[in-house]
């Protein structure tokens, strides 16, 4: 339960259950004590109705307690192995009381008991002692069970005794008893019942400073008067009084004697003289007595005066003594005050004059009283000496605290370590008591060997927690030295820079550091020494040096204190002035660690200044819980932007709203906002802008964000209907775009105002809002133009990086007033950034926390903003201080939880504090305990308000204004959907144009028939191949292969390869494919020639004319050439290719043939080519001059973005080229292209363009025989032997088509291949074969190939006559024009055959010329050297025949081929040969199938 019950008795009556102060008894169901070897307590409440503990489940359902499923009532129970005591708040009661220690206070069942219970256990309290008897019942003392009789234990604060009937606790000042049933009887005479005593400050451990009692020592002036002088008697007065009468008597007597006169007469005269003398003596005696009485009275009066004066002085003197001791209590006294959490804790603040004033001990010092007297040095009588003694006594205060001010000094302490350790401990204790850890932090360098003995007890004191570093400020080894001193050095550097920037007015640094150095070895070689060599007080640091000898101290010491021993010390210097003031140092504080620990408990909560909250949420700012309560719809309806455009930016006091109104007649029209990093500048601007959205509809207010850094505010507000765009990434291209957009908006507004005859935005919007109730002959606008709030976050970056953009903003500030454009320029450092024009037009300024006083002065003309410490707090200044207010702005990023009913719960996680004072989690019970429910998935208040604004807008009939700033072009834009049409459609979407001067972004339509030949210039890696893909794919999607066809030539990195399977693509060729490229060029050339001839024949000049005249459709053929400059200048093919391309550029467009090519360098294209390229597009080029060469000086500033380029419309215009698919994902782009290609390939069943005929690189016999043409040949009893390189047609032996078929290999290996291949192929036909191999040339091949049934092998030369006879028979049939049985005669070696048969050359030639006509085909094998170059009659003769054959030699090297060829032709591979017809007059290079090793070894 909370400490509320400690305050007033009424609350005790309402809630009188105090078992656990942490729990609210009203929410509590049961408290369960588990009675085992150790007592455990479980509390079940509304917040936590069930818990599992050590395998047992405790829970409350419907007010009933269940333990492991068993119902349990209050009191003692046993559930299985568990013994429990269940307590219910409904039947329990807690009371507090006092007892007489000398009496026996009994709790038990005896009738004499002070508190009579039903149980047998008995507890007796007497003289601070417990006497406990369990009497066979359970009793727990401090959670441990007690068994037996007369268990005696001394009473300690915190002791607890649990029995069946009660829980007894000893508190600090009272006894606390909780009884568990209503049967307990109280003997009220045995104790004094009380309200619970307050043991801790209110809201403990939170602590707030109390109003300080500021006592000043009296300074009265006193002057002690000396005693008045006594009246002195006349000197010889008695003689002067009696001598004359006596003299007269003597003279009379002498005269009488001498003259002889009458003696009687003389007697009379003598008597008179005697009488006169007698009276005179009597009078003298009387006066002397009176003088004595008066002198006595004088002395008595003076004594009374002295008593009164001394009493008066003593009162003031004692008052002064008390004040001195009050102001600076001894450390021991402070420990007593800490024990009771005295209200004087943390009473001193940095602004107090006694800030960091400490006392070193007690001694004598001059009194503040002025006591003087008028006694001079010559007055030495007793009274005077006494007065002098009094004056001397009251002029000195004795045994009073001797103080020293540490705030502006460097202190040097001299003495032994034990003495100095005590002295420093006492100093730090005083500082820690009187000064908050928010104002003062400690950093001490102590010896490693004495850390655990002397300093470890200080480790938890919050003053030793360096707030800026989150580390403990005790350096006691090398590890802590490295961590702390390096970080502290950085703090000092920052402060030094702030001090340097501050100028004349010195800043006050918080916290102030007390830097105590016992062991300076840690400083060796450290950069911090440069600061220690100077006065550090200006940096908010007091250094205390502790040395055994004065000689070891540094020269920076301004206060020097010497401790001679534990009981004698002397202040030698104070503020560099010799004072020689002795004192008696304070001794060690008893139980210092206890005092430190108690002081550590406090969490200092500072009092709110000016009632401005330290933090404020967005909805708190409006004092609502739900966004619906904002009444946004009503606010929009009642808004009058022509009079005010105010927004609530925060509070200037408790519920005192602070509005900012940029209307030109209030705080506007423009403003400056300043705030350093962490000041909450972006959050403030967000709060201001969302406030505008709350108060005004999108028709009234729009906002445009300029953010040099990108993101930021724009990302948080882009969902608002008021949001009109963001200008980010202001590099070269972005700047030009932004300038054009802003200028276009200003121009648009001026034109619109002029159009409707108004001169400002108020007049325009008044007309707009009046359109629903029109007046005759009045024009009304149909579109709203809102006030535009133009926010530039960090415009200092703009000035340094994009000065021309800031110039445009300056122009906006100058002319935007009447146009409804309001400029807010925000920056971290306004110094040197704000020019005169901006300053003159920025009526209001907002300054949040500024980095320096100079920056604050730049905005506010005061230093106030430099001293702000809280994010979101700032000053608003309008004009010349017409408004000057401090405010706290609302923060919109807090979770939106309108149903929040926060319940404080106990965080059960356990942390350990490591060696440097940081916390580390060591135990987590399973889930993080948070205050209230989990808010991690909740939207922020900003998001909730934006959603509400959108809801209100969507429910309204308001018109969304046109946006002046369109979003930056996306870097990846999928191509729009295109569909195929029956008619040819050459117009395709190619990219998105960005035209800021017209405030529009629109599709760029590319029409090949209009754009004609096109060149795309781009450096490598910027998407030129992707543009080609987009062109090809979109044209292919819209048209069939009968309408558009493509020739793909890729001189780059296979960018066109994904398109090769399109049904529209004739073929694709790479630069390295020499032969295929040559064929592609020939194909293009032949098409040009064919169409020119065709058009000439029809009598037309262009494709459109041809189609109109003949009604015949010809496909448009587009040659796509990627990376033209990949064809190097040294390439021998370049000249031919360029010539063909020039011809295509000149003649192709009219014939329906177009070229689209990409080029990496403008200079790579010949002028003759460039002049014939109608359309030029540019992507990013590394050389800016090339962009100028293509686009001119008005080029668009380049952006280094893939796919970003420019095209020439009326002027160069930026474009983002579309991706070739509808999926904008890079990873899936290639896959998407392939899928689309496959779909189109499968969908098209019509006629396709012919591929470039090419033999495969690998042509195995299996692949060869799978060709349909090969299979057709075999069905027709032809013998396929290979494939034409030029046409890929099948070449081989066609029966009855030639006098003979010649095999002329270059070497034995090729001979074996020819032989093996022939055997393989003749095995596939049914025609009979006669293999004549007299010299066994086929022996090696036949060893691996078995002959089929249709082959007869003749090796015996005796069979030669039969062979010749057979040939003669066929000759005869030929002459009769008859056909014999089809037969193949294979002569394995011509030279050997002639030798063995002795057949004359003429007869052999005659046979060859005729036998093939009758059905006998002769196949002759002869080495090339023999058949081609021998002068024997037979080879010489048969060379003249129109034979067909396979020649293994280069064309240049053989006379068997009649035609021109190059000597640079490479040697033929074993798989290559020339296929010759008509005796060599026609020839074609062919590729032979490759026989695998297995096939050769069949």
From Swiss-Prot:
Residues 655-857, 1001-1188 form the FtsK domain. SUPFAM superfamilies: P-loop containing nucleoside triphosphate hydrolases. InterPro entries: Firmicutes_EssC_C, FtsK/SpoIIIE/SftA, FtsK_dom, P-loop_NTPase. It holds the Pfam family FtsK_SpoIIIE. ATP binds at residues 675-682. The keyword Metal-binding does not apply. The keyword Repeat applies. GO terms for molecular function: ATP binding; DNA binding. Keywords: ATP-binding, Nucleotide-binding, Repeat. This is Ftsk domain-containing protein CA_C3709.
